[in-house]
Amino acid sequence: MTAFIKKLLSPVVELRDSEVGTSLMMFSYSFLVMTAYTALKPVTRSKFIADMSAENLPLVQFAFGLVVGFLMQGYSAIVGRLPRRWAMPITLGGLAAMLVGFWLWFQSGSQWASTGFYFFGLILGILVISQFWTLANEVYDPRQAKRIFGFIGGGSSLGGIAGSYLTLQAKAIGTTNLLLVSAALIGLCLMLVSAIIGRERPEIKGSLTGGEDEGVGAGEALKLLKSSRHLQTIAMIIGFAAIGAAIIEQQLNMATAASKGAGNTDSITSFLGQVQLYTSIIGFVIQVWLTSKIQRYLGIGFALMILPTSLGLTGTLMLINGALWVPGLARVLDTSLRYTIDKTTREILFLPLPNDLKQQVKPFVDVTVDRFSKGIGALIVLVLINKTWGLGLGWQQLSWASLGMTGLWILAALRARREYRAIFRKSLDQQVVEPQSLRLSDADLSTVETLVEEQGHPNPRHVVYAIDMLESLDKRHLISPLLLSHDSPDVRARALATFLLVGVSNQPA
C-alpha cells in the first residue's frame, strides 16, 4: 500500500517509505483545518453585519488590534501550564467546544454573540495556521521540509476552496449551523494531530500563537528599524498593503449589506463565501503558475507594483460603477495578489540583509508592523465612514482614500526597488548572504542578473561566491563555461565541480 501511495504521489512529491503516513496525515490536517477556518470567516462578517451593522466593523477591528497581544499572552500563559506535546490537541478540542458554545449563544438571540464571535474568528485565524506550521517544523528536519512542505501546504489551498464552497451552501445549511460543521472538522483535526504526535513524538518548541519566536524585543527592533532605510521601506510597503486591504474589505462589507439587506444573513454569508471561493482559486493559480514567472522574467520592481496598481484601478472602477461585483472583484484581486506575488516579493526584499539582522528584526516587521497597520487602517476607515463625528463617506467614496494610498505605495515600491539593487550589490561585496540559506523563490530577475554579472568580477573570491549563489538558486546553467579558463585555480576548480555535478564536464577548456 505504501509503495502504491508513493507512486501515486510521485509527480507531486518525493516521499520515503517512513514519511508516507505522517505526510498524508499532515496534508489532511492542513486541508481540514483550513476548510473549517474559511467556512467560518464569512460567517463572522455576516453575523456582525446583521446584528451590529457594517459601519461598526472597523471599531471592533481596531479594538482587536489593541488587545490581540494581551489575548495571545494570556493564551500562552494557559498553554504553558500544559504538557507541551499535548497543548495542540487540547487547544483544538477547546476551539471545537467554543464553536458549539457560540452556536448555543446565537440561539439565544443575543446581539453580543456576533461581536464575541467576530473576535473569536480573528483569534482562530492566528492559532490554526501558526500551530500547523509549528508542528510541521518539529516533525520534519530542514532537508525533509524542502521536499515535503509544498505538498502538505497544498492541503491548505484546497481547504480554502472547500471551505469557501461550504459557505455557498449557507442558505441550505443555515449560517449558524456552519459553526457545527466547522466544529466537527476541527474535531477530526484533533484526532489527526494526536495520531501524528503519538507516531512522531516531536518536541514542540515553536510558538503556538503566531507570535515572534525569534528576534529581539520591540524596543530593540525599533532601533534596528531606524538604523536601516531599507527596513523602513519594507515596513512601509507592509503597512500600505494592510491599510489598503482594510479599505477594500470595508467597501465590500458595506456594499454587501446595502445590496443584500443587512438582516439577510444567509445571503450575505453566501455572497462573501463566493468572493472567498474566487479568491482561493485565483490565488492558487497565481501562486502555482504566475508568481515565479513574474519574478523571474519581469523582476522585483514589476512585482512590487502589481498590488498598488490593482488597488488604484479597482478604486477608480468603484468610483465609476456602484455594482456589487466591483468591490467583490477588488477584494478577490487584493487578497489573491497580497498572499502570493506580493508576499513572496517582500520576502525577496529581505534577501540582501545580514542573517543576524534578518533574524532579529524580520519577525517584528512581519508580525507587529502588519498588525499595527491593520489597526491604523481600521481607525482611518472609522474616521472616513462615521456619520456622527467622522466624514460620513459611503463605500464608493472610500475609493478616494485608496487612490491616495496608491500614490504613496508606488513611491515606496520604487524606492524599495532602488534600495534592493544597491544593498544586494553591497551584500555581494561583503558576502553577508549565506548561499545555503537561499530558496528558489529568491531567484528574481534582478538578483540573477547581478549574480551573472558578478562572474566577471576581478576578485576570484567574488566569482566563487557568485557560483555558490547561482548553484543554490538552481541556476547552474547560467554559470559561464569560460570560467574553466579563469586565471584563478580556485575559480576553475569551483566551476569544474559545478559542471561535473550537472553532467557537462565536457565543456571546452
Predicted feature residues:
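Intracellular loop-helix junctions on the cytosolic face of multi-pass helical membrane proteins
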Residues: M1-L24, A54-P58, R81-W86, G93-A96, ...
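Short inter-helical turns and helix N-cap capping residues of alpha-solenoid HEAT/ARM repeat scaffolds
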Residues: G456-N459, H486-D490
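A membrane-interface helix-boundary motif in multi-pass transporters
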Residues: P83-A87, L166-L185, S267, L298-M305, ...
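Amphipathic alpha-helical scaffolding segments comprising HEAT/armadillo-like alpha-solenoid repeats
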Residues: L445-E454, L473-S485, V504-A509
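C-terminal transmembrane helical hairpin of 12-TM major facilitator-type secondary transporters
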Residues: F302-I341
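C-terminal ends and interior cores of transmembrane alpha-helices
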Residues: G93-Q111, T291, L307-A323
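Structural detector for internal amphipathic alpha-helices that build alpha-solenoid repeat scaffolds
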Residues: P435-S441, R461-S472, P481, R492-V504
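Substrate-agnostic recognition of the 12-TM MFS/MFS-like secondary transporter fold
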Residues: T22-Y75, A113-L168, D213-L224, R229, ...
